[in-house]
């Protein structure tokens, strides 16, 4: 019997689910914290845990598997260099899911998904760099 072996379809086609989870995993690796709905958070956990385990393996085949999953070489480099080193001594349990109330528009339950022992400065790093670059460009123009 296959009782309890299912997964959430989340009202999406298989290809849409696969793309959504790839994008969510990439965002989580980049920012180390994301806010999403609780069912999506519970579904993304095993995907990201397996990616971190691939990063800890560190061989070429694992790197290619990670690239095929999240499709961003820059994030795969972060996964294999930064995150793999951070969790070298931890056997699983790299992700924390915390309930975060309800969304205003449709009252959907929200959750914060973050890496355990995350780098707090990683969240918003790209935005800070973009704002600093714009400020420098304005200063040069003036």
Curated annotation (Swiss-Prot):
Keywords carried by this UniProt record: Ribonucleoprotein, Ribosomal protein
Pfam families: Ribosomal_L17
Transmembrane segment boundaries: none
GO BP: translation
GO molecular function term, any single one: structural constituent of ribosome
Any one GO cellular component localisation term in the record: cytosolic large ribosomal subunit
Superkingdom classification of source: Bacteria
Entry-linked InterPro entries: Ribosomal_bL17 (IPR000456), Ribosomal_bL17_CS (IPR047859), Ribosomal_bL17_sf (IPR036373)
Family: Belongs to the bacterial ribosomal protein bL17 family.
PANTHER family: LARGE RIBOSOMAL SUBUNIT PROTEIN BL17M, RIBOSOMAL PROTEIN L17
NCBIfam families found in the cross-reference section: L17
Subunit structure: Part of the 50S ribosomal subunit. Contacts protein L32.
Name of this chain's protein: Large ribosomal subunit protein bL17
Source organism of the structure: Brucella abortus (strain 2308)
Source organism phylogeny: Bacteria, Pseudomonadati, Pseudomonadota, Alphaproteobacteria, Hyphomicrobiales
